[in-house]
């Protein structure tokens, strides 16, 4: 069975769970702890960066407001997920895939991280020239031919070649 690793802040995760009326269902461990690699018995593990942030004097203010710190931390968590996919086979922290939610592009920009989204960050980090965003559901899988483009601009950007590339990927 799959093990899911969540990179983030335990405080923010608990606040979000409370707002959404969800009981926390994850096991939590300090992201730097050697225990992080031994938690195979737990299906969902939150790799908590709060202790490290506290030591470094970094405090996430409101999880509902864009600022430089939240942008830097969001970027850091995505980079951690990417790095986990690049770990060697057999490494207990290796990930086979990354699942993401939306990022706050304003917060990333405030942190000096100028990417239209994490799709482009993942592609650049992994040195990929051909890449696409994919949505996966129970009955439907969709690979997008364009990403991060305003609807009004699609008619000027979408080409047969882009559609074929998406199909090929």
Residue spans for each PLM region:
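Contiguous, glycine/small-aliphatic-enriched amphipathic segments in soluble metabolic enzymes
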Residues: 1-118, 160-169
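Flexible loop/hinge segments that line or gate small-molecule binding clefts
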Residues: 118-143, 147-152
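Glycine-rich phosphate/diphosphate-binding loop of Rossmann-like nucleotide-binding domains
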Residues: 144-169
């Amino acid at each position: 069975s799959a093990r899911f690793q969540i990179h983030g802040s335990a405080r923010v995760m608990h606040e979000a769970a409370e707002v959404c009326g969800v009981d926390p269902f994850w096991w939590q461990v300090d992201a730097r702890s050697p225990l992080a690699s031994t938690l195979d018995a737990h299906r969902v593990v939150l790799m908590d960066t709060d202790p490290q942030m506290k030591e470094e004097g970094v405090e996430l203010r409101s999880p509902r407001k864009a600022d430089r710190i939240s942008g830097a931390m969001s970027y850091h968590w995505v980079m951690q997920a990417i790095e986990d996919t690049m770990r060697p086979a057999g490494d207990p922290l290796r990930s086979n895939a990354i699942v993401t939610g939306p990022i706050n592009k304003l917060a990333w920009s405030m942190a000096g991280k100028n990417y239209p989204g994490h799709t482009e960050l993942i592609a650049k980090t992994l040195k990929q020239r051909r890449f696409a965003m994919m949505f996966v559901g129970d009955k439907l899988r969709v690979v997008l031919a364009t990403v991060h483009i305003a609807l009004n601009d699609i008619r000027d950007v979408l080409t047969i070649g882009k559609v074929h590339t998406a199909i090929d990927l």
